[in-house]
Amino acid sequence: MSELFDEAPRDPGPPARSGSRRSRALIVTAVVLVIGFLGLSTFAGIYTDRLWYVSGGYGAVFTTLFWTKTVLFFLFGAGMALVVGVNIYLAYRFRPFFRPNSPEQNGLDRYREAINPIRTWLLVGVALVLGAFAGSSAIGEWRDYLLWRNGTSFGSEDAYFQKDIGFYVFDLPWLHYLVDYAMAVLVVALIAAAVVHYLYGGIRLQTPRDRLSGAAQAQISVLLGFFVLAKAADYWLDRFDLVSQGGGVITGMTYTDDHAVLPAKNILLGISIICAVLFFVNVWRRTWLLPSVGLALLAVSAILLGLIWPGIVQQFQVKPSEADKEAPYIEKNIEATRTAYDVANVDVEKYDPATALGAGSASMVEEETSSVPLVDPQLVRDAFEQNQQVRAYYSVAQVLDVDRYDIDGNDRALVLGVRELDQSGMNAGDRNWTNLHTVYTHGNGIIAAFANQRSEDNKTQIDNADNTGDQAGIVWAQGTNAGQDALARATGGFEDRIYYGEQSPQYSVVGKATPDSTDVELNLQTAGSDEGSTTTYDGNGDASVGGFFNQLMFATKFGEPNFLLSGRVNPNSKVLFNRNPADRVEKVAPWLTVDSDPYPAVVDGRILWIIDGYTTTDRYPLSEKESFQTMIDDSLQEETGLRTLPTDEINYMRNAVKATVDAYTGDVTLYAWDEEDPILQAWRSAFPGTVEDKSEISDDLLDHLRYPEDLFQVQRYQFARYHVTEPIDFYQGNNRWQVPEDPYSKGKFQPPYRLFVDSNGGTDQVFALTSVYVPYNKNNLASFVSVNADATSDQYGQMQVLELPNEQTPGPGQVANQFATDPEVANELAQFNRSGARPVYGNLLTLPINDGLMYVQPVYATQALSDSSFPILRYVLVKYGNDIGFGSTLRDALENLLGVSTGPGTQPPDTGQPGDNENPPPATGTVAAQIRALLAQAQDAFDAADAALADGNLAEYQRQIGIAQANVEAAMELGQKRGSAGQPSGSPSGSASSSPSESPSPSS
């Protein structure tokens, strides 16, 4: 090739100066050092990554990713380099040997003389640099490539092109990339060829005629022909994009797309093919007239047909009757969206909530509300830390988790926090490399509290600045104090060391040089000692340090020479890194969208982090697109840095995978949860053996799997609009709902809550994830939505919506305002506010109770002037219909609401069988006991009346109803007298409540 690139004998020129040689040598040395350092860093990252994957049993994932990316880099990089290099070479090879003398050519002589000595190097360098850019870009397309290669059928077709949905999800993105790549290569090659032709006289811009040589015209015509042909392929693919593009009233095909944009794409496709043929013909005809006309026609058609004509159709055909025109398209969008987000089978029931509780419903309400979680996972975090932290270098998450355990035969909800290592709490003098990475290596244990239970004395102390009164009213299920072992009883004990967690250090070096070496890793202090014990990690997690080469690689990766210098690093050491559970799942399954909230569970004697993994796409035809972050942006959402695939905008979502990460060993296990999901099937084909079958999930693990919050939030966001199935109503926004704003966090959605609620059509309660809707841009309540969150249930994942009538049932914001402005509540809160305490409102819970809706909200108190203060559960507010009750406990609040005692107390005297006397006898005992006795007699009379009616004895039925009414009226009269005397049962103004500790009933 070099002889072809020689134009004239080279002039050796004057001898080079020694100074310039030294400068050149220094520059070359610096470049070599920089390249060597970057190469070593890159290699160290790849090498240690391979060690990490292999140690975790996912070496096949590393191999697949590495070779896929490598092949894409070299294949597409070589394609760009080859096409550009060949075109540069051809442009130079067929340069004109005679160049007419002109000012233009005389000016270009300087550039030709400068380029001539380095022509070959310049050609190779330009081709390689452009190839490297193209190859690097291709690496980012590995997901599309693997999906295209391993994609399968969805089993259904779109409504317009009758293509399997798999074509849009698996094939279309990769085909788009191939066409875009081809167009980019042709554009770069065209520019490169044109520059070379211009430099060497093949293109002469300042001559009046023959501005292009024959070779230049032929080469440029061929490149333009292929480019326009690629554009035709792009128009063909663009047709299919119409079913997943947004920007209109819906995502997907609209009337304008169907009647203007789609025909325009077909016409432009045909014009592009004709234009390409004209460019190819121009190789022989040597005239630019026909190609220029074709290119001009394509450009004008693109403007007229692609932009102006759709605008005319939209403005003059669609706008005057848009609802009717768009109705068929909206109908298809509704059907596709409900399918893509899996909300097509939501059970919607009309629900007309009662506004008052019946006289005989007190015990039923008490039973149904016994499992209401009063311990707010967000607010009690400080209480967890100050009471169970033990040392400043331990911490728990900002928002705690809720899970359920079988404790003493009862299904109980617990608020859980993992006691993780938080190195920011270490003393400044202890913060050296040895301590940070070999001594302070792990956390210890789980802290657990009953979600629905108060401390035994049933009161709280808020007058001590350190809040030591009753540990925030919390009843511990697992902690550091003696006797708090309910979780241990439920699980049979467990490995409590936490080496992998949400707050774990970047890396730790663990392991002893010999079995007789001293343990140096600091463990949780032992009972009765102020000093922590020591331990040594003996799990199989992550990579072994090994010999000098591995130590050098880790030293390079982390920029830390102590890997080579410290005596704590030995051949038996392991390096624990990539320790965040969600990050570990992302790394072994880089095709998953990972849930933002991993939660801990004790399973088979180990602490596991459970993480939900989703398959998402933005290519599901006709389904509505929305930002994933927007849909899950509630008041508890934290920035995690986790990615949403393929983009933040999605229009399809499935909880395809349940993943676990062992908090001690770091072992990651993926289980196929939705085995019918075609996207999961494609990834299992791409990475065989990495995802276990659903049947491999143990019973103990299954007990702790739950419906994921991110999925529920996405579904509730979409269902707020897509519960409307009539196209005209949908277009007009009739009956549109929205997720309410959190009353205490402006601009954020109210988060969903995990509650035990009545099962659909059953008598038992089920563990559910719940939320509410309000009408669009209004504040009253529209509906209550829940989903069965119990993975062991046959009804798992079944969503139920209780749709309220249009009357003004107050929504969360309105209820929060009613609580704050209620005279009795406001007066009581003002009293302890004046004493230096500050009220903090907990979760505002909504739950269906006794054919109505009850709001429950805990109120915490914290010392306003104390930095060490943490919220203490002080009051509970309840609302049913128009009535508000409050008290120190939920039972007290219900008593205050109902005007009766719901718990055990003084037993009423034996008054005989109902019906012995129509006039109720004078009751004895306390007023509350009298009321209970009267209501019990009334309930007995109602039962007797029902039995008489069943037997057809109308006379007895009427007599028993009279007795019941007399007892109810007497009870109401006593309640009114007690209220006027200012003695509400359970009033928080008392120093202590008379009711016993609140112990929840079995919930299932």
Curated annotation (Swiss-Prot):
Membrane topology: Multi-pass membrane protein
Bias kind Low complexity: ranges: 903-916, 979-1004
Membrane-crossing residue ranges in chain numbering: 26-46, 71-91, 120-140, 183-203, 212-232, 261-281, 293-313
Entry keyword annotation includes Ligase: no
Region: Disordered, residue numbers: 1-20, 899-924, 974-1004
Keywords per UniProt: Cell membrane, Membrane, Transmembrane, Transmembrane helix
Record flagged with keyword Membrane: yes
Cited Pfam families: UPF0182
Residue ranges that the Swiss-Prot or TrEMBL entry lists as coiled coil: none
GO terms for cellular component: extracellular region; plasma membrane
Source domain of life: Bacteria
Subcellular locations according to the entry: Cell membrane
Family as reported in the entry's similarity comment: Belongs to the UPF0182 family.
Identification of the protein by name: UPF0182 protein Noca_1530
